[in-house]
């Protein structure tokens, strides 16, 4: 569904109602307590949802809708559920090769990265996984360690230093490293992205009612989070 309208037309209230209805969803099941007739009864069948809120904090209103299980993820470390996202953590049952391919697409979709930087990024991501004992055809069983964002920064630098590009191209790629990947390692961004484990495993995102507040992240990191979460959910459903 695509919901649009002028300011004040009720878009947010409609979405709040939909989210509340999903979590309080009920289904009819056959009641076997009466052998003389066929009857049905309602049974709670909550449907998890994920709200990515780019501006304001209007969806916190859902906490008044009798959803005690509601989880609000925010960049602020002082919240009950501070946002922690390791992009290199991926669903069990998926091959590493598949995740690397998708993760490169996330980086390129969130940040403008001109060739040949994507090639170096791909090599760097594969390299940090190999440093933790991974092979590209490995299927994730949850037993091996995941690399971190700071490891990617260092590996990207190493891969760049081993190239034979002229100084201008190397300078442009160095700018990509510092402005794109480096932006995910500064101040509060480091606490969000440079972690061993995410707040939730990829599989957990499909089990809870969750709001992710993106307003304070800035455009690039907010785009990165949005694309990453959508990718992890698709990967989980596929795995």
Outline where the language-model segments fall.
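The conserved Walker
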Residues: 6-7
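P-loop NTPase motor domains
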Residues: 17-239
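Conserved lysine of the Walker
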Residues: 11
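Hydrophobic anchor at the beta1->P-loop junction of P-loop NTPases
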Residues: 3
